[in-house]
């Protein structure tokens, strides 16, 4: 992936626990607010829990009823830590697979950026979300591996 980064893509930051992926994304989000509208970070576990309660994922996909009434840049933090599937009154859904599928379509049509942090490697992503999602990661994202020991104390 060296030398093949693109400003048209979002970021996919992955690596071991505690290496600073979420902190990097929070800093990047704050910086982007100075230049553009920025973006919010949403913890994937919270998204799955919200689906279990309301059954609604519009905010994270087409956003017709939230923010500014259209899709916006967004970061999904801690992908792979959410319940799979989430259950809304008997309707089971792999929430993040569904969201990433829609965000891919939005990226194709309008280059809408999505950002992700995860501890999962590409093989784990395929096992959790399928080959369709894994296959599109490099097309939609600049992939960055963050290595090192945990920085938590």
Question: Locations of the language-model features?
Answer:
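Motif I (Walker A/P-loop) of helicase-class P-loop NTPases
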Residues: 25-29
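AAA+/P-loop NTPase substrate/partner-engagement loops
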Residues: 30-74
């Amino acid at each position: 992936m060296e030398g093949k980064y693109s400003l048209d893509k979002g970021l996919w930051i992955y690596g071991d626990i505690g290496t600073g992926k979420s902190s990097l994304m929070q800093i990047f989000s704050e910086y982007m607010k100075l230049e553009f509208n920025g973006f919010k970070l949403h913890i994937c576990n919270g998204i799955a829990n919200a689906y279990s309660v309301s059954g609604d994922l519009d905010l994270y996909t087409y956003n017709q009823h939230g923010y500014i009434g259209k899709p916006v840049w967004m970061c999904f933090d801690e992908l792979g830590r959410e319940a799979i599937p989430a259950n809304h009154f008997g309707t089971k859904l792999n929430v993040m697979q569904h969201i990433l599928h829609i965000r891919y379509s939005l990226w194709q049509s309008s280059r809408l950026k999505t950002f992700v942090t995860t501890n999962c490697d590409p093989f784990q992503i395929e096992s959790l979300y399928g080959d369709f999602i894994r296959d599109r990661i490099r097309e939609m994202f600049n992939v960055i591996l963050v290595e090192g020991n945990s920085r938590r104390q």
